[in-house]
Swiss-Prot record:
Gene name linked to the record: wdr21
UniProt cross-references to Gene3D superfamilies, sorted A to Z: YVTN repeat-like/Quinoprotein amine dehydrogenase
A single GO cellular-component term on record: nucleus
Domain of life: Eukaryota
Protein name stated in the entry: WD repeat-containing protein 21
Originating species: Schizosaccharomyces pombe (strain 972 / ATCC 24843)
Subcellular location per the Swiss-Prot or TrEMBL entry: Cytoplasm; Nucleus
Amino acid sequence: MSGLPFHIPGYYYNSEKKRYFRIISSGQSTPSSNIYTKERLKRGKRFNNISKERTKGKGGNPVFNFSTYLFDRQFSQYPYSCNDDRDYLCAKNLKKINLRQLPVGTELQKIGWLREVNTIILTSKNGDILGCCLTPEDKSGVANEKYTSEGSIQDFSLSRIGLSNNPISSLVCNAMQIFWSTSPSLQNEGQFHISTYNQLLGESNNYRWGSLKLLKTPLCAESIGEMGFAVGGTSKIAIINREGKLTQSLQSKGDVFSLKYLGDNLVIAGCRNKSVLVYDLRTKKECVQRFYHGSSICSMQNLDFSQPKLLVSGLESKISLYDCRFLQSKKRPQSIMSYMGHSNLLERNLALMKNENGSIFSSAGDDYVLRFWKTDCSLPFKEMRVDDGKYLCRDGSWVKAMNGTGWVLPYGRGLLIYEP
């Protein structure tokens, strides 16, 4: 290097070793593999040479590499820079609704959507179960609302439909029914609860409940169509029909953190021990298919029922997409797509959502940033910082209301709404 070295924030240049070192908070320095170090340059050069050798044909001419072309094309279309404040334009796209009627100290956590009655179901850390009906504004321009909202044209009608004595561990909704599970306490064991929401009265009826003692600690739940609901917990999965009766118990050999229904009686479970288990509810076996992810699994999302593709998010910096039709041959299969930019190294439950047709999905990170990907692009096309970083977005849902569509996420004492 000729002349003075470049000044890089957070690094200093050692003239004897002719390389950069990273400065850590305690004042010491450690070698860092970045784009300015010799090791990084040598590794990149060696990787490029290996790639060229692999892409050569018999005649010595380079063969067209579709994956390289696809990645370069995706990278060139990525419009944002990680150090640019434009990444976090939340004023125009992300709206925050403060629910003033909620008591001080209330923190919303779970969300579900009742499609038939166009109602959002919310749960709080204190055990509140709230119904939030989406209604359009009157023709006179006066909003028909039971509380005051700030900074949004959306209109909500909020009502409390239940109160749980124990913390609510999971919430799921189908067309008309609400299903939630509660964690065990010193006085009570884990339980499940089922009720039907009455839109006219703004309350729930046909209430049923039961014990989940076999699960020890319920952790997640999923609607499985006409068969009812599936609840995942400590080393087991319980299948409960719509009448509130336990119909089946499945072994998982690991704590189940996420459940997804793929249709055709297939249920997929993501576990703490990095395994993804596929169950066929028509059989009595433990599981019909098993494969392993790169890290402990936190959230999953299915993109399409006709061509079952599964998004898997774990305690790592990427989200993987698997094709469930080609997972039988290998214990550690290769994902068909990896989505970079995700950040989740601390939390178990963070929001992972998709839109109606599965072409766009979103994920919340432990750095208080919402990221949005297109399923055919490995880099996020939009990133938005969530407010001041007080609360993590642990759950979210795609909502198709009468006056618009978008993602809704519970956040503290309010809601975050993003309309693409």
